[in-house]
């Protein structure tokens, strides 16, 4: 699986609902970012994740999906632990 950053460019609630629905199906795993956006563990491409969340066709909300190849910065410990536990999983 790969780690992605999903950034809503409008309302985040429709994307959150899509993430929760797919998490219950075991398709994705995710955690919220402190202000806006989500870090997502998914076994497909950026386009496939965008399609799954309804971003591509606009059926949920608009947003940007970015694959993460490395990470660094300052964030809550729980976020770093979440990423580390899923990196290369």
Roles of regions detected by a PLM:
Residues 75-89:
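Charged phosphate-binding loop/patch that engages nucleotide di/tri-phosphates or the phosphate backbone
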Residues 25-75:
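Short, intrinsically disordered low-complexity segments
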């Amino acid at each position: 699986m790969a780690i992605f950053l999903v950034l809503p460019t409008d309302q985040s609630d429709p994307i959150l609902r899509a993430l929760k629905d797919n998490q219950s199906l075991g398709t994705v795993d995710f955690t919220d970012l402190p202000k806006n956006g989500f870090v997502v563990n998914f076994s497909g491409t950026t386009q496939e994740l965008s399609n799954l969340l309804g971003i591509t066709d606009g059926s949920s909300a608009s947003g940007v999906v970015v694959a993460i190849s490395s990470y660094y910065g300052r964030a809550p410990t729980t976020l770093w632990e979440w990423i580390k536990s899923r990196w290369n999983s």
